[in-house]
């Protein structure tokens, strides 16, 4: 464990993670300054921390303050390229991310899950397996509860953490027992200079792992396969397209687990989660517990009892023969592709939001094949309209509520309305969850035609 008493620590970013970091360092006797671009009045939930000696640097990041710190603890939403942070790095000030700081304090083995899509579902699936197995597991990270909160207890048997590329940018010694790379498609290109930089951030997950550790990788994702050919740890693959000699495979009806001379088969008809992408999530989630000795019947019962997460392809309502789905978590093109691919019948797609700089071309085939009406909202609407012009009927809406009204007008019985934005939410909402809640309320308020 690191020693922080008396050290001047600047926590950059006053979101949920930043507040957790501030509390962590205050509890250890550090002199803590919370630095944020917002004004002091705009910060919430800081009164208690202020009473315990937290100091503030508001309205921007003071370059001299950061350059004079003993340590900078950076929130994942703050790029290392922010001038004051970059200047401190150049001055030799150590800059560490939340997962690096937390991992140094935690003794329990960790499963760290990254990838472009499926991270949250896989993380929660594994947490459910651990719970049913009787193991005390912290489940969080980029999903929900920040990893730093796990340090408030020493009783964990396992740490199950969703990890983002942003979090991996500021690691040094971070080393999970199991590192999981679910898939790689274009995302966050508003933060990264290109796809190569994004992939490089994801691959940092494995850089401190050793032959004692295990990488769980998607054998069907060509970019994952190319990127993980030379890892310092063991590899266990999973595939939803074939049965593997070693690893987790799929024959179209059964998940087949082959490892160390053993074979187990699981019927996917038992699962509440639907769609091939969820078969992949289940396969990935099963691997670490089964390798650690969890009985197969307990693991399978756990995943079969899991019905999914909010705002991830959730059926909100059926009205006048139309099914309405909330997939507000679909914040990148790859996620929308998987959601559309799992739907039958004509689709009205509500998409748009804050553009992340990616390429919309991978959606073109499904837009032309399945989408009868595309209703666009938000900042990205112009780019998306240009990308899909001539492929389907395109409508524009000034708000999500207006988009729901338009969707009801144009979608006939037997059709599906899908909110799967392919963009982040921050141009119109505080989070994808708020966007999903607004959508659900608007759908529930619709009046049927009799």
UniProtKB/Swiss-Prot annotation:
Pathway membership, UniProt: Cell wall biogenesis; peptidoglycan biosynthesis
GO cellular component, one term: cytoplasm
GO molecular function: ATP binding; UDP-N-acetylmuramoylalanine-D-glutamate ligase activity
Location relative to the cell: Cytoplasm
Catalytic activity of the protein: UDP-N-acetyl-alpha-D-muramoyl-L-alanine + D-glutamate + ATP = UDP-N-acetyl-alpha-D-muramoyl-L-alanyl-D-glutamate + ADP + phosphate + H(+)
SUPFAM superfamilies xrefs: MurCD N-terminal domain, MurD-like peptide ligases, catalytic domain, MurD-like peptide ligases, peptide-binding domain
KW ATP-binding (keyword) present: yes
Keywords linked to the UniProt accession: ATP-binding, Cell cycle, Cell division, Cell shape, Cell wall biogenesis/degradation, Cytoplasm, Ligase, Nucleotide-binding, Peptidoglycan synthesis
EC number in record: 6.3.2.9
Enzyme class: ligase
UniProt key word Repressor: no
UniProt-annotated binding residues for ATP: 115-121
Primary localization class, coarse: cytoplasm
Gene3D superfamilies the UniProt entry points to: Mur ligase, C-terminal domain, Mur-like, catalytic domain, NAD(P)-binding Rossmann-like Domain
GO terms under biological process: cell division; cell wall organization; peptidoglycan biosynthetic process; regulation of cell shape
Family: Belongs to the MurCDEF family.
Function: Cell wall formation. Catalyzes the addition of glutamate to the nucleotide precursor UDP-N-acetylmuramoyl-L-alanine (UMA).
NCBIfam families: murD (TIGR01087)
Protein name in the entry: UDP-N-acetylmuramoylalanine--D-glutamate ligase
């Amino acid at each position: 464990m690191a020693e922080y008493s008396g050290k001047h620590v600047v926590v950059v970013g006053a979101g949920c993670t930043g507040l957790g970091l501030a509390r962590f360092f205050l509890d250890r006797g550090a002199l803590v300054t919370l630095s944020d671009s917002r004004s002091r009045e705009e910060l919430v939930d800081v009164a208690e921390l202020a009473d315990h000696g937290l100091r503030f640097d508001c309205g921007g990041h003071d370059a001299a303050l950061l350059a004079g710190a003993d340590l900078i603890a950076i929130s994942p939403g703050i790029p290392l390229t922010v001038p004051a942070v970059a200047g401190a790095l150049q001055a030799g000030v150590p800059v560490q991310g939340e997962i690096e700081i937390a991992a140094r304090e935690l003794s329990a083995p960790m499963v760290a899950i990254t990838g472009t899509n499926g991270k949250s579902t896989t993380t929660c699936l594994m947490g459910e397996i651990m719970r049913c197995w009787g193991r005390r597991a912290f489940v969080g990270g980029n999903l929900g509860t920040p990893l730093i909160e796990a340090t408030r207890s020493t009783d964990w048997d396992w740490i199950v953490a969703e990890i983002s590329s942003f979090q991996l940018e500021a690691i040094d010694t971070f080393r999970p027992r199991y590192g999981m790379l679910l898939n790689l498609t274009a995302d966050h290109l508003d933060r990264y200079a290109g796809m190569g930089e994004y992939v490089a951030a994801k691959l940092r997950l494995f850089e401190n792992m050793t032959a004692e550790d295990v990488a769980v990788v998607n054998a069907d994702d060509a970019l994952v396969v190319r990127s993980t050919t030379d890892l310092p740890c063991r590899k266990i693959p999973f595939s939803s397209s074939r049965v593997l000699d070693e690893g987790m495979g799929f024959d179209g009806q059964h998940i087949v687990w082959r490892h160390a001379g053993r074979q187990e088969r699981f019927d996917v008809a038992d699962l509440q989660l639907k769609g091939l992408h969820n078969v992949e999530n289940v396969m990935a989630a099963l691997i670490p517990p089964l390798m650690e000795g969890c009985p197969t019947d307990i693991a399978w019962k756990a995943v079969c009892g899991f019905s999914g997460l909010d705002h991830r392809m959730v059926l909100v309502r059926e009205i006048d023969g139309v099914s309405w789905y909330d997939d507000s978590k679909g914040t990148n093109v790859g996620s929308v592709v998987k959601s559309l691919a799992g739907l039958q019948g004509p689709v009205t797609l509500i998409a748009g939001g804050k553009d992340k700089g990616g390429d919309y071309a991978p959606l073109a085939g499904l837009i032309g094949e399945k989408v009868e009406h595309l209703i666009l909202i938000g900042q990205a609407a112009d780019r998306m309209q240009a990308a899909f012009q001539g492929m389907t009927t395109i409508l524009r809406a000034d708000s999500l509520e207006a988009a729901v009204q338009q969707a009801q007008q144009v979608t006939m019985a037997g059709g599906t309305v899908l909110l799967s934005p392919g963009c982040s939410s921050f141009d119109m909402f505080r989070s994808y969850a708020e966007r999903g809640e607004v959508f659900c309320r608007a759908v529930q308020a619709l009046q049927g035609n009799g």
